[in-house]
């Protein structure tokens, strides 16, 4: 099982709502997390992707990105111990277009934000991270924009 598959399993076990979203963590390169989800379990009465599902998936992508970055710091640094606890502090989304198809989310952390986050988490045992995300349709058009603030704490 890959690290992303293990994280998805942890999420589904801990947050029952996520089982219904049928999401998949499709990739993480240390700066961008990719999440995908099908329309079928997430549609609304108009047959488009439900805004509530989009909000949940965007929030989840930001949480997962923060969690992966914090857990990587723990693995890389001998004198830092886990577990890591991450919570969403703030989140705002702006819906741009209706979505009649499957969804791809790109959750992105800038190099400067990632560096500051790692430094503060290592020094203080807690740190906030801003994650920006875009929900895309299959053509690559942005259907929703999101910005979230997450707090990570070491020691759970």
What are these model-predicted stretches?
Residues 33-35, 89-91, 105, 129-131, ...:
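Hydrophobic residues positioned within well-ordered beta-strands of beta-sheet architectures
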Residues 1-16:
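Extreme N-terminal tail/first-helix region
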Residues 19-23, 89-95, 116-118:
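Short structured motifs
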Residues 38-78, 82-85:
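Hot-dog-fold acyl-thioester-processing enzymes
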Residues 98-100, 110-156:
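HotDog/MaoC-like acyl-thioester-processing domains
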Residues 17, 31, 85-87, 101, ...:
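Residue-level preference for beta-strand/loop junctions
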Residues 65-112:
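Hydrophobic beta-strand-centered segment that forms part of the acyl-chain substrate-binding groove
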Residues 17-49:
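Catalytic strand-loop segment that frames the active site of acyl-thioester-processing enzymes
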